[in-house]
Amino acid sequence: MNDKKLERHIAKSEIYELVCMYMRGLDRLDGPLLKSVFHEDAYCDYGFVKTDPDTFSKFCMDALKEHIANHHMIGNSLIEFDDSEDMAFGEIYFNAYHKTIVEGVNTDVIIAGRYLDRYERRNGIWKIAYRSEVNDWSKTEPTNDPYFDDSDCHRGGRQDDPVYKRNKMYRP
């Protein structure tokens, strides 16, 4: 493997990690983490909101805190480079699940779409410089999830989620 291929492989890995941290920030309602994946002068264009990362992060935290649960998953991730070694473009497929209450009824909102991103490496660090969201389809229906009524299950949370308790990840 030549040096350029190796550098691009490392860059793709670092960019993919940004995408994962973005999803964790949404699901765990971790505003500082969500904001950290963007350059300060980045632009977020989601159609219904077009703004800077700080305002976008606050918007997400306010909107998602009203949900019972959120779960974002990454699908196909195509990261491409043009001539610059410090700029890359991504098409990141996602599925977003939101458990909400609509008119007193627990409701599942499922969205499938893609993030169209421009990433820039500045001072050796990759971050999102531009992100847009394309929604390909969505589905809304009443929730049917009796499995999660079992109190013995580990439940995902917000900032009290087990992922933030790494010091307790040992066998008793």
Where are these regions (language model features)?
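Transmembrane beta-barrel outer-membrane domains
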Residues: 13, 69-70, 108-110
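Short beta-strand segments enriched in hydrophobic/aromatic residues
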Residues: 26, 38, 94-96, 132-135
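Short, surface-exposed coil-to-beta transition loops
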Residues: 72-74, 110-115
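Acidic/histidine-enriched, glycine/proline-rich intrinsically disordered or flexible terminal extensions
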Residues: 141-172
